[in-house]
């Protein structure tokens, strides 16, 4: 998650109280909550009390007198760095103290009272699941409610996640982010005030070997099957005409497990596909479509002859990556503390081991750069868990009072319609040269922008390779 405080507001206190400065905390470029300095100071003091002064980052000091505009801007920058540092710390960023603070602040900012509501969650095939939740229910609460409605066993809930998406005209989903433990799904989706935004249930792991655990259960099997059919229909999974014929035959026989076994062998099975964007690979300002999955980022591009090509970047060959956000400065290049902020430009840049002795930066410019970074991190995390012999089955936080709420009337996962004929343009896919020798090293960033870069993400799954491995 990318935390930022891009702006401040001067607001009046309740009942005509004295004015104060509010700091707008954004997550992935969208307003999450609006807080006062005193609220963040209270959070800081609570974290220090629980974890010690040596663990918690430094906090901007109090001031005896009212702040000048320049001092407000300085404090904004310091608070932004503080929030980023806390979130990136594995201990502090996952703490209930930090996450509950953000949930309360989100609810207060949007002025949503705590009450029981109906929330619509979509499956990958567009099927609607209506669950009854509280407006103050956090992400895991809602996930458990959806699982209960579908009768998905408790031990399989950890294989799925809720995603905030924007539904496009063709019915496909543009992924905004995976809903996190610090937010309230009902508030997150309704605060966007657009019917385009939905919450979708989708599997949350990358390694198809984990499919075996999910497929043992009828509901889990149906969820994987519905997601796979949807991904094929939208062109996320690449199929030839012959493969499509085989899949349709298995679908007609309602052979769901065999259907999934065949789908697992197809290119881009289980990948997340992002909207079209721009990369500097294999040349500057190259239009590409990025997909994430199977421990790699895939870049598809169309050459002048309309031939599709693909370049694959394995996460084990990425030494590190970073997300950079920048905002064009007003004409004249000067920055005002209270200036309005333009549209944020996001870049994902990763340092890639092209050959044994050659590391090179590759940059992708996309509004979904943060989501791509999250995908990279989760793939690395999954690789490390598997390498250590661990399991992705997670222990679920239990509600006060014990067991999950189970609905009296479970909802079945509907079987999707038969596959339509494939798009012939999806068949011609040529791998780029594995040496990638045509790409030259270039830096990132621009002197004409006001940039705020998040910390570089080191990759613990990075492996050195030799030329014979390329």
Swiss-Prot record:
Q: What is its main location?
A: cytoplasm
Instruction: Indicate the segments forming the PX domain, all copies.
Output: 1-109
Q: Which residues carry this modification: Phosphoserine?
A: 336, 407, 409, 415, 421, 437, 440
Q: Which residue ranges does the record annotate as region Disordered?
A: 401-426
Xref: Gene3D superfamilies: 1.20.80.60, Phosphatidylinositol 3-kinase Catalytic Subunit, Chain A, domain 1, Phox-like domain, Pleckstrin-homology domain (PH domain)/Phosphotyrosine-binding domain (PTB)
Q: Does the keyword Isomerase apply?
A: no
Q: Which residues form the Ras-associating domain?
A: 115-206
Name the segments for region: PTB-like F3 module.
Answer: 270-432
Q: How does it assemble?
A: Monomer. Interacts with APP (via cytoplasmic YXNPXY motif). Interacts with KIF1B. Interacts with the C-termini of P-selectin, PTC, LDLR, VLDLR, LRP1 and LRP8. Interacts with KRIT1 (via N-terminus). Interacts with HRAS. Interacts with ITGB1 and ITGB5 (via NPxY motif). Interacts with CCDC22 and CCDC93; the interaction associates SNX17 with the CCC complex. Interacts (via C-terminus) with VPS26C and VPS35L; the interactions are direct and associate SNX17 with the retriever complex.
The record's comment about this protein's domains reads: The PX domain mediates specific binding to phosphatidylinositol 3-phosphate (PtdIns(P3)). Required for association with endosomes.
Family membership: Belongs to the sorting nexin family.
PANTHER family (UniProt xref) = SORTING NEXIN 17 AND 27, SORTING NEXIN-17
Q: What name does UniProt use for this protein?
A: Sorting nexin-17
- Tell me what organism the protein belongs to: Mus musculus (Mouse)
Lineage, uppermost ranks: Eukaryota, Metazoa, Chordata, Craniata, Vertebrata
